[in-house]
């Protein structure tokens, strides 16, 4: 019985270690059919349009994103601002990113 809590903690740790984030998942995980280029500090974002990089927290201008590296496939809106679905339920616009039922 003493090993049950240890096994539970081990299983949770493995689950968390194998989780992926916006740019660390295999590119087909979110329905994308092209590989997106990484951008931003520590390559934590993806190029959503030419000259535009989005991370989990914000979108910004970036010279790292060329036309051949962009990844917009699913479009969404937050208010009146157009954006891109970065993952299921998550929309990024020029003003930032937030949850969205459109994605």
Curated annotation (Swiss-Prot):
Subcellular location: Secreted
Any one cellular-component term (Gene Ontology): extracellular region
InterPro entries reported for this sequence: Neurhyp_horm (IPR000981)
Residue ranges the record assigns to the propeptide: 31-103
Residues with PTM Tyrosine amide: 30
Coiled-coil residue windows: none
Keyword annotations of the record: Amidation, Behavior, Disulfide bond, Neuropeptide, Secreted, Signal
Disulfide bonds: 20-25
Tissues expressing the protein: Detected in thermosensory AFD neurons, neurosecretory NSM cells, AVK interneurons, pharyngeal neuron M5, and the mechanosensory DVA neuron. Detected in male-specific CP motor neurons.
Main localization, broad class: secreted
Signal peptide start and end residues: 1-19
Any one Pfam family match given in the protein's UniProt record, by short name: Hormone_5
Single GO MF annotation: neurohypophyseal hormone activity
Disruption phenotype: Viable and fertile. Gustatory associative learning in response to salt cues is disrupted. Males have reduced reproductive success, due to a range of aberrant mating behaviors.
GO biological process, one term: neuropeptide signaling pathway
The keyword Acetylation appears for this protein: no
Family of this protein: Belongs to the vasopressin/oxytocin family.
Role, per record: Ligand for the G-protein coupled receptor ntr-1. Plays a role in gustatory associative learning. Also plays a role in male mating behavior.
Name of the protein in question: Nematocin
Organism annotation: Caenorhabditis elegans
